[in-house]
């Protein structure tokens, strides 16, 4: 099957091309921290020759607690993204939660992301499709890989086929996630070869059944990411923080920022190796 290429400016994203890194921080905590984190990602990815897109959220609208930090909001968030793009010359990605946010965000950010909890909301999908922007769809934890074809079809009906899919794990009983590596190729096949990336950060989440914040398995980030890269991915999605234990959102799953380079050295080595192999058809 021919793999679809989705272009983010001069960055080509496809299942059979070198992987693209979608990385940054979970939520915009401050302008200065965002600049610091982006600068480190840019330095490391340029050194290693990895195509890079900066990620952060301007509003975490789905926090468990009403008291949890959500972010700077749309207006201030777009100012930070504009400065990051101007300063570092990077492409950017962020999520939207309401149909009214799609157009103004797409005027600043290069890729707009459809959150997992909202991936079947048709009005939001249609609003995002109308922007013409590249779309990243998070696979809901409660949706099977094969069902992702229906979500992609909604975007195509809305006139936009520039869609990337992102696996972030599936529900495994209550308050736990598991990643079905076989589902990666199921998503590729169900969508006619659309690029599939893997969000290793959020796949590491755990929950206290009665708690108001997510836990995580940061110590296992490398082993889970290595497994994903071995399947063959269009990209890897990861969040990092200089002080994960002090992060305002999802710190327990965040990669320590100073571990980014050795982490990516491993990921690139696996990606290069896997994509050097000829295709092996074992179906017959």
From Swiss-Prot:
<keyword id="KW-0448">Lipopolysaccharide biosynthesis</keyword>
<dbReference type="Pfam" id="PF00793">
    <property type="entry name" value="DAHP_synth_1"/>
</dbReference>
<dbReference type="GO" id="GO:0008676">
    <property type="term" value="F:3-deoxy-8-phosphooctulonate synthase activity"/>
</dbReference>
<dbReference type="GO" id="GO:0005737">
    <property type="term" value="C:cytoplasm"/>
</dbReference>
<keyword id="KW-0808">Transferase</keyword>
<dbReference type="GO" id="GO:0019294">
    <property type="term" value="P:keto-3-deoxy-D-manno-octulosonic acid biosynthetic process"/>
</dbReference>
<comment type="similarity">
    <text>Belongs to the KdsA family.</text>
</comment>
<comment type="pathway">
    <text>Bacterial outer membrane biogenesis; lipopolysaccharide biosynthesis.</text>
</comment>
<dbReference type="InterPro" id="IPR006218">
    <property type="entry name" value="DAHP1/KDSA"/>
</dbReference>
<comment type="pathway">
    <text>Carbohydrate biosynthesis; 3-deoxy-D-manno-octulosonate biosynthesis; 3-deoxy-D-manno-octulosonate from D-ribulose 5-phosphate: step 2/3.</text>
</comment>
<dbReference type="InterPro" id="IPR013785">
    <property type="entry name" value="Aldolase_TIM"/>
</dbReference>
<dbReference type="InterPro" id="IPR006269">
    <property type="entry name" value="KDO8P_synthase"/>
</dbReference>
<keyword id="KW-0963">Cytoplasm</keyword>
<protein>
    <recommendedName>
        <fullName>2-dehydro-3-deoxyphosphooctonate aldolase</fullName>
        <ecNumber>2.5.1.55</ecNumber>
    </recommendedName>
</protein>
